[in-house]
């Protein structure tokens, strides 16, 4: 369990883009997938692993680099570590909020709906750095299965997000 593994991994790497390239990745839909048996670290670390992961990375802040209109729907995710579904911006260190907005790094118009998750190492959905996201009609049947008990968590949560709607989830 010392390896970093993911079921589906989406990366926008600011370091790999040409200076004048559009860094916004639009209209990516992940639907009707079965993701299962993804082992990973079960302790707190700087690398989130799991079922469906979408990250914005880079060694420096690159404005206008992110996801827009990302849809994750009707998927089944079973026995994954650490998270069922998560996305975050990792080109900003320290005070995330201070740089996300002014540099247009928000992940915008994210939809996560109608997914079924069970036997999740930590949390079902950890949505970070998102604006105008909707998370609805998801079911998490068993979370915090292999995560150390000293670090409490919840099944679904926004982190450093604005105008995120979480509704009708179980």
Q: What positions do the PLM features span?
A:
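Right-handed parallel beta-helix
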Residues: 1, 22-39, 64-83, 96-123, ...
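Extracellular beta-strand solenoids
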Residues: 10, 35, 54-55, 87, ...
């Amino acid at each position: 369990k010392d390896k970093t593994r993911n079921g589906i991994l989406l990366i926008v790497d600011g370091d790999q883009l040409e200076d004048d390239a559009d860094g916004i990745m639009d209209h990516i839909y992940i639907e009707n997938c079965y993701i299962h048996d993804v082992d990973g670290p079960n302790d707190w670390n700087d690398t989130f692993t799991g079922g469906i992961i979408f990250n914005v990375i880079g060694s420096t802040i690159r404005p206008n680099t992110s996801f827009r209109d990302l849809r994750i729907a009707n998927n089944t995710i079973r026995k994954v570590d650490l998270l069922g579904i998560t996305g975050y911006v990792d080109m900003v260190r320290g005070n995330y909020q201070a740089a996300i907005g002014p540099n247009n790094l928000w992940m915008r118009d994210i939809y996560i709906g109608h997914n079924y998750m069970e036997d999740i190492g930590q949390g079902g959905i950890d949505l970070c750095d998102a604006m105008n996201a909707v998370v609805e009609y998801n079911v998490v049947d068993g979370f915090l299965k292999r995560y150390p008990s000293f670090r409490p968590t919840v099944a679904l949560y926004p982190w450093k997000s604005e105008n995120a709607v979480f509704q009708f989830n179980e």
